[in-house]
Amino acid sequence: MTFKQKIKSHYQNLLSEKINELRFMISDLAQDAQNDAKGSAGDKHETALSMMHLEQEKLNQKLAEIIAQKNVVDKIDADAIHTKVALGSLVQTNEMLFYISAALPKIQLENKTIIAVSPQSPLGSQLMGKSLGDEVEINKNRFQIKSIE
């Protein structure tokens, strides 16, 4: 398994775990709301139910975001070799190692720190289409591309 394949696999596992965790929380909340609806009445009860529904909506929204991120990562061809920065590129700069995918938490793999950035982010959009040796500047930080996989 190549380093880029390991990165993709790590992010897929991370996102799958988060999806399962959110689904469990949503299911748990729905069950609590259903149980509360059976036996209580009154203003406090209605307020509690409303709060549960709001929390459930927030969790559903977060779940949709994470599923969308996982769909982006799933579509990446980890075997593709890039000469220009594109979705799925692993970009080594003079400062950091970037994985062009979705905005995800940074990870440590094989003693390297990988920062996942989306192509739509300020840094990602500047990196897209660049080649070996090109430079980009974000917030007065200059990044020179040392390698692209």
PLM features: what roles do these ranges have?
Residues M1-I76:
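N-terminal intrinsically disordered, low-complexity, charge/repeat-rich segments that act as generic
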Residues E135, I145-I148:
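Conserved hydrophobic positions within beta-strands
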Residues D79-E137:
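Non-DNA-binding regulatory cores of transcription-related proteins
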Residues S9, S16, S27, S40, ...:
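Generic serine detector
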Residues A41, A48, M52-Q56, V85, ...:
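Alpha-helix boundary/capping detector
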Residues K75, I148-E149:
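Sparse recognition of residues in long alpha-helices and their boundaries
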